[in-house]
Amino acid sequence: MQFAVIGHPIAHSLSPMLHETWLKAAGLFGCYTTLDVEGDGLEAFVQKVRKRQFDGINVTIPHKSAIIPFLDRLEPAAARAGAVNTVYWDGEELVGANTDGTGFARALATWTNAKNSLVIGAGGAARGIIPMLPGHVTVMNRTNQTAEQVAAEFGQSAVPWSRTLDLTPYDVIINTTSVGMAPAIDQTPIELTATTALICDIIYRPTPTRLLREATANGLDTLDGVLMFVLQAAEAFERFTGHKPDIALGEQVIRKQLEES
């Protein structure tokens, strides 16, 4: 069995370690690699997949939306999000799925106060997460027009970008941008003032991000990107192989690797 994650850049991905851990635990013989695919090479790569050179692929920035025209059909969540992070075979069809939202929803399941959420960013991950959130969602993005478009698609609202936004209305705040990831590891997308919200960051390298460190220092509850990463990967793995992976094992392996790197 041959699997891969594609993106540009892609060298930072921990997906190979996670999926190969699960393959071994399931007694399956397979290989999972990272492939740096630039935009103009995406269609040619999908043609390789169609020749059964791969049994499944994961998709990350910047291809989550760009890959859609090259697939046969989309799962409902991917169609709603307009973004794909998993491509798998269903018979002779290449199917696009989006497990970002369900992965985040499972990670958030123990938090019962999610009635008014702020989502920072309006890219593929945000589009996957927004429809899975309970209650009202407000979208904030550096390009306000994009925030308004994405919010309107899901019947939600948008606010103009501001690092000093009044956070008092929100009980959950989710960073879906790359702010906090290298090379911007010393930056945060917002200033955490006058809030009691759960602070979430989908970034898993580094962990915790500066945003989460500041949240902890302020006595706030936090949710890092590791569990979401593992849960969305687990849903992809099940589509690829038909096997349910060990979530605890996956989280343990990833956290250990992050601590050592």
UniProtKB/Swiss-Prot annotation:
InterPro entries: Aminoacid_DH-like_N_sf (IPR046346), NAD(P)-bd_dom_sf (IPR036291), SDH_C (IPR041121), Shikimate_DH (IPR011342), Shikimate_DH-bd_N (IPR013708), Shikimate_DH_fam (IPR022893), Shikm_DH/Glu-tRNA_Rdtase (IPR006151). The keyword rRNA-binding does not apply. NADP(+) binds at G121, A122, G123, G124, A125, I202, G225. GO terms for biological process: amino acid biosynthetic process; aromatic amino acid family biosynthetic process; chorismate biosynthetic process; shikimate metabolic process. The keyword Oxidoreductase applies. It is an enzyme of class 1 (oxidoreductase). Its EC number is 1.1.1.25. Keywords: Amino-acid biosynthesis, Aromatic amino acid biosynthesis, NADP, Oxidoreductase. NCBIfam families: aroE (TIGR00507). Belongs to the shikimate dehydrogenase family. Involved in the biosynthesis of the chorismate, which leads to the biosynthesis of aromatic amino acids. Catalyzes the reversible NADPH linked reduction of 3-dehydroshikimate (DHSA) to yield shikimate (SA). This is Shikimate dehydrogenase (NADP(+)). It comes from Exiguobacterium sibiricum (strain DSM 17290 / CCUG 55495 / CIP 109462 / JCM 13490 / 255-15). The gene is aroE.
